């Protein structure tokens, strides 16, 4: 029998406090998603069909993190999810949605409803701006067969030229009391759009994670060999692809990664792995970040069904030991129950953590609401569950094309308590990490990694760490017993 190492998880260890002059409110949580993409907070929502679609992704990016849209949908639907995130807000919308004057109000309604916008610029066949259609123009219109050109606000409009700053645009919009400012070139061709909502969101969400065009960042999951899906997602503006597999150290994953890096200009996160060798091979094949974790998730049964995996603390430590030599970020995926677990993962060298169960219970997650014994819950399932595998994740567990009655699941379906908005959950997690960094005297995540010292604790130590000897009469928002 070959025993490679003693393996530990989050509940097996604690960080030792250090002399500190650092206050939690003064620490920086900036980190990296990949070697080329930054994060303002080290949190990622998981690519699971009960966790991340566009609503969760938008909420995460506004707070400074990022969401990874799951792949249990056809390519066009996933592309639409990415587009919704990308068009949800922007400093300057460089490719604005527009409509032509001969279209009907019914056509315009489809566009505004689909993209959740309140109006659209109107252009002619040459792309020249000829008007704008807003809620004010259509508010009292009942005949949706009318032409857009008969109802729109016609030129001349208040416009701005390419290159205007957001501050200048804000002053101009305030002066003329308008909510939308079309951007045109010298020939009056529509080139962009600035909305008052985007300017307000810049103030409301100062830590929002945005790309070079002022759009929210978002990632998307793909499976083995899905180069066509990857290409469509890149065209839609996705910031990073997550090549998602239960076993990231497989020949097909390595081959797919190499093909993507040859044909597309996009950062690729690859996982999941738990060993030094796997990390090294993924980096050699072109991975821009390595995702770590086999079996730590609350809904994952891989370790029991297959007898394979590694406790998460040791897995992170293994992978960081290799990835840090190449300056490749490590993402700790799974096993996060408390903010203290996040702090431990970051102290071990992870650049960010991926969260499923804690976000599955939020308002923005796509899971179904349910009532059980008078309390609100939301559905949550592993991507290795029967339900998720029949919807499209079977390739993640190397069972693509297998009949539903022949699938061997590596996950379960369940429910989690409703936890309010994504922002409420992230607020508590961020607060816990800040507190930990204060105890460690760490001004930033790199210092946390450099400073942290761990002790291994016993089962008695774990029992002492949790609430004991008292009945909880009022639940805390960051402690679940």
Residue ranges and their predicted role:
Residues 69-72, 98-99, 119-121, 159-161, ...:
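Catalytic beta/alpha-barrel core
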Residues 38-44, 91-96, 211-220, 259-274, ...:
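Short beta-strand/loop segments at the ligand-binding rim of alpha/beta enzyme cores
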Residues 1-21, 161, 285, 307-332, ...:
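Alpha/beta catalytic cores of nucleotide-metabolism and tRNA/nucleoside-modifying enzymes
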Residues 62-77, 238-250, 288-306, 336-369:
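Glycine-rich phosphate-binding active-site loops on the catalytic face of alpha/beta enzymes
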Residues 55-58, 228-236, 274-292, 332, ...:
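Catalytic cores of alpha/beta
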Residues 23-40, 46-48, 77-115, 122-124, ...:
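Bateman/CBS regulatory modules and CBS-like beta-alpha motifs in cytosolic regions of diverse proteins
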Residues 69-74, 117, 121, 128-144, ...:
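Short beta->alpha transition motifs characteristic of CBS
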Residues 25, 73-83, 141-145, 189-209, ...:
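Active-site-adjacent beta->alpha loops and helix N-cap segments on the catalytic face
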């Amino acid at each position: 029998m070959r025993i490679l190492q003693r393996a530990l998880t989050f509940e097996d260890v604690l960080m030792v406090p250090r002399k500190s002059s650092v206050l939690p409110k003064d620490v920086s949580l900036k980190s990296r998603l990949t070697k080329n993409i930054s994060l303002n907070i080290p949190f990622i929502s998981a690519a699971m069909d009960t966790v991340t679609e566009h609503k969760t992704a938008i909420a995460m990016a506004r707070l400074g993190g990022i969401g990874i849209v799951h792949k249990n949908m056809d390519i066009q639907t996933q592309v639409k999810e990415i587009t919704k995130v990308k068009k949800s807000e922007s400093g300057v919308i460089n490719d604005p949605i527009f409509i032509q004057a001969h279209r009907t109000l019914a056509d315009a309604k489809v566009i505004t409803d689909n993209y959740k916008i309140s109006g659209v610029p109107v252009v002619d066949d040459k792309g020249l701006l000829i008007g704008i259609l807003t809620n004010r123009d259509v508010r009292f219109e009942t005949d949706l067969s009318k032409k857009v050109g008969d109802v729109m606000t016609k030129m001349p409009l208040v416009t701005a030229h390419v290159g205007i700053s957001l501050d200048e645009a804000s002053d101009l919009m305030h002066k003329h009391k308008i909510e939308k400012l079309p951007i045109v070139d010298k020939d009056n061709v529509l080139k962009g759009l600035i909305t008052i909502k985007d300017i307000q969101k810049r103030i409301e969400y100062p830590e929002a994670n945005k790309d070079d065009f002022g759009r929210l960042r978002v990632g998307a999951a793909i499976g083995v060999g899905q180069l066509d899906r990857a290409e469509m997602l890149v065209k839609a503006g996705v910031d990073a692809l997550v090549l998602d597999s239960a076993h990231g150290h497989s020949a097909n994953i390595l081959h797919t990664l190499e093909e993507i890096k040859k044909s597309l200009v996009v950062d690729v996160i690859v996982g999941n792995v738990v060993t030094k060798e796997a990390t090294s091979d993924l980096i050699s094949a072109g991975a821009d970040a390595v995702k770590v974790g086999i079996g730590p998730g609350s809904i994952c049964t891989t370790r029991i069904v297959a007898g394979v995996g590694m406790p998460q603390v040791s897995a992170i430590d293994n992978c960081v030991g290799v990835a840090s030599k190449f300056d490749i970020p490590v993402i700790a995926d799974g096993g996060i129950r408390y903010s203290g677990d996040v702090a431990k993962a970051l102290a071990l060298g992870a650049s960010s953590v991926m969260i499923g169960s804690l976000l599955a219970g939020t308002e923005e997650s796509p899971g179904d609401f349910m009532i059980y014994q008078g309390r609100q819950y939301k559905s949550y399932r592993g991507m290795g569950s029967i339900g998720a595998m029949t919807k499209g994740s079977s390739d993640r567990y190397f069972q693509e094309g297998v009949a539903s009655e022949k699938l061997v699941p590596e996950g379960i379906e369940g429910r989690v308590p409703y936890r309010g908005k994504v922002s409420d959950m992230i607020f508590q997690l961020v607060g816990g990490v800040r507190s930990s960094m204060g105890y460690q005297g760490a001004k930033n995540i790199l210092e946390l990694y450099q400073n942290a010292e761990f002790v291994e604790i016993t089962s008695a130590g774990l029992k002492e760490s949790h609430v004991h000897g008292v009945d909880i009469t009022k639940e805390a928002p960051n402690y679940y017993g």
